[in-house]
């Protein structure tokens, strides 16, 4: 966070969130996860630039392209190994950050992509350095995701694509100012747990983490931060809340809620060189996060079970 702010990167919170997401107890796992996160970020940034360049002037085609891309990432992510699946989720998330962040100004897509890639790379380097300094043990064999049952990858692709399409339709009709962020969160939640054996439970856990992270992040931003806060003061305020998220990630039983908590907390607290105290904007962004996760839960609960009733063989 200090380096991101010193380098005057646009959104230091993404660098801090990257550290939290790639930090795992084992040095081996940390390096592998960081590698796949970097690959996912680079591919996602490139895909985001291409999608904006091709479809930014055609909103409906743009929404369809993002939905198909989400479905493709979820489909492939279900069929590959654990950290490769994670990379696919981050690929779409980065594509969404670039695409939705620059669709109103397509000429700025490359700048957005470069900024996000730099922030993620900085976070990975910091997490890697910390892993080397404080590594407790090494693990020779990585954990692999269970092989998907026949048809599971296809169903997960449908889930993710339809979640993005439903959110996009609401954004298109309502013209909600934070609609792009709402769509981004709906797709991200659907993809992060696409290959999870208990998708609904995992996503509900993430939602609980989102709620807690949002509340604590807003509390920090509007009650504890001051307009003249130095980096040292911001660090002292943030430290106990970041430690809470890190402890949650270290326990497999709380990784889902901790993932949601860390993302929501960093987005809501929004630490930066120039702090923003726009309460209305912060509440709108918080609503977009929470409703986005609810859309993905609806996709898990409602969209595929109907299909399963018609095709009991799982195909």
Please report, for each region that a protein language model flagged, where it lies by residue:
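A transmembrane helix-and-boundary motif of multi-pass membrane transporters/channels
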Residues: 1-315
């Amino acid at each position: 966070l200090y380096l991101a702010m010193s380098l005057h990167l646009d959104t230091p919170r993404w660098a801090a969130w990257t550290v939290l997401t790639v930090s795992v107890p084992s040095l081996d796992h940390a390096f592998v996860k960081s590698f796949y996160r970097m690959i996912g970020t680079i591919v996602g940034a490139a895909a985001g630039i291409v999608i904006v360049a091709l479809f930014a002037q055609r909103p409906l085609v743009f929404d369809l392209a993002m939905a198909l891309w989400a479905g493709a990432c979820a489909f492939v992510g279900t069929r590959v190994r654990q950290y490769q699946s994670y990379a696919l989720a981050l690929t779409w998330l980065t594509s969404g950050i670039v695409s939705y962040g620059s669709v109103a100004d397509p000429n700025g897509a490359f700048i957005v992509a470069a900024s996000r890639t730099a922030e993620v790379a900085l976070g990975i380097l910091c997490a890697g350095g910390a892993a080397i300094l404080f590594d407790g043990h090494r693990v020779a064999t990585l954990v692999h995701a269970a092989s998907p049952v026949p048809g599971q990858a296809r169903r997960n692709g449908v889930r993710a694509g339809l979640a993005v399409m439903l959110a996009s339709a609401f954004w298109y009709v309502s013209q909600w100012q934070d609609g792009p962020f709402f769509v981004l969160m709906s797709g991200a939640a659907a993809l992060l747990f696409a290959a999870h054996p208990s998708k609904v439970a995992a996503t509900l856990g993430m939602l609980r983490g989102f709620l807690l992270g949002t509340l604590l992040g807003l509390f920090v931003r509007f009650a504890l931060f001051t307009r003249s806060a130095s980096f040292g003061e911001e660090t002292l305020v943030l430290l106990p809340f970041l430690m809470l998220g890190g402890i949650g990630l270290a326990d497999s039983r709380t990784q889902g809620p901790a993932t949601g908590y860390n993302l929501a907390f960093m987005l809501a607290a929004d630490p930066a060189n120039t702090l923003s105290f726009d309460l209305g904007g912060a509440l709108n962004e918080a609503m977009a996060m929470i409703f986005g996760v609810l859309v993905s839960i609806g996709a898990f609960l409602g969209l595929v079970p109907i299909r399963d009733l018609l095709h009991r063989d799982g195909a």
